[in-house]
Amino acid sequence: MAKEAYKRDKPHVNIGTIGHVDHGKTTLTAAITSVLAKAGNAEMREFGDIDKAPEERERGITISTAHVEYQTEKRHYAHIDCPGHADYIKNMITGAAQMDGAILVVAGTDGPMPQTREHILLARQVNVPALVVFLNKVDIADPELLELVELELRELLTEYDFPGDDIPIIKGSALKALEGDAEAEKAIMELMDAVDDYIPEPVRDVDKPFLMPVEDVFSISGRGTVGTGRIERGVVKINEEVELVGIKPTKKTVVTGIEMFQKILDQGQAGDNAGLLFRGVGKDEIERGMVVAKPGTITPHTKFKAEVYILKKEEGGRHTPFFNNYRPQFYFRTTDVTGAVTLPEGVEMVMPGDNLSIEVELIVPIAMDENLRFAIREGGRTVGAGTVTQIIE
């Protein structure tokens, strides 16, 4: 059978299900595919099929994630569901599956539980733009309890800086919908309408300001210095002014040539592997680990706060805890930089398998903005992963 061409007639959005263990995330994922399949907008995926999620490696960390796709009348969705709690934490912190929004699943029978809180906090820390809530198992919950659960949820969302009063909360039963109950199926359609309307359409990488991490540098005699790398976002054109940022002093220059696969282009865009030729840049002024960016859009920093996950021994991480002033390498985009870790007040040590907020001071500045992902390494071996949550200086 020939592969169907990917139609780009609808906006594409990445979402995922989050929430406490056994509250019905995977059942809901299966129910969405089953209800949308009836409308001809998805392929039905069985619960067991989603639950046996394949393992993937992202920044040296193994994560189990199930990928499902479906569409509504308005959009095309890629949906991720993780079987285990640790997989969620790793997924959100490494950005393995960058989410444009998430469906928070809460069982009406239990209300918010510890992992509910933890997932909301993580969603805030790693900047998931919007959440929609599915209050599940309402068929077996006490109606008076449901009202309390909804109030409690709105307070919890507000506590973590989400607009708790405005977030849509849809009540339903994922299991009943999966069994084909008409009322329950209606709630799933209502949920998808809320996701369509409430989760904002993401800005495409190509529409963001230009940025390319430098992977390699070489000189072409008589022509100048070339930096190569994969363009992360935006578009660059010949004769445009750019800045070289990070590690060394920031330098303005002009792109005098763009090459891709030995072809000369007049522009490069997000996703392209390109070589950029710079005017008046010496080979000693640019190196791997710097970025080329639209002037004024990114700045170099050494001190930041981050949310990190530290690998367990079984995951190939450290075998022992680390303490304040731990000095590993932080791998940003294309290079390792040594940094010192400051643990939060009252935390004496960090055990393999922990996730927490830390403060880091790097020995050289790196071009960064909030939300930048990194790996934590010791001698080239990954021992953790993180996301920049706040820049200090």
Swiss-Prot record:
Stretch list, region G4: 136-139
Main location: cytoplasm
Signal peptide feature range: none
Enzyme superclass (EC): hydrolase
Binding-site positions, GTP: 19-26, 81-85, 136-139
Quaternary structure and partners: Monomer.
UniProt-listed Gene3D superfamilies: P-loop containing nucleotide triphosphate hydrolases (3.40.50.300), Translation factors (2.40.30.10)
Gene source species: Chlorobium phaeobacteroides (strain BS1)
Entry's EC annotation: 3.6.5.3
Protein function: GTP hydrolase that promotes the GTP-dependent binding of aminoacyl-tRNA to the A-site of ribosomes during protein biosynthesis.
Binding positions for Mg(2+) per the UniProt entry: 26
Region of interest: G3: 81-84
Molecular function terms from GO: GTP binding; GTPase activity; translation elongation factor activity
NCBIfam families from the UniProt entry: EF-Tu (TIGR00485), PRK00049.1 (NF000766), PRK12735.1 (NF009372), PRK12736.1 (NF009373), small_GTP (TIGR00231)
Protein name per its UniProtKB record: Elongation factor Tu
G2: annotated segments: 60-64
Location of this chain's protein in the cell: Cytoplasm
Region annotation G5: where it falls in the sequence: 173-175
G1: annotated segments: 19-26
Gene: tuf
Keywords noted in UniProt: Cytoplasm, Elongation factor, GTP-binding, Hydrolase, Magnesium, Metal-binding, Nucleotide-binding, Protein biosynthesis
Catalysed conversion reaction: GTP + H2O = GDP + phosphate + H(+)
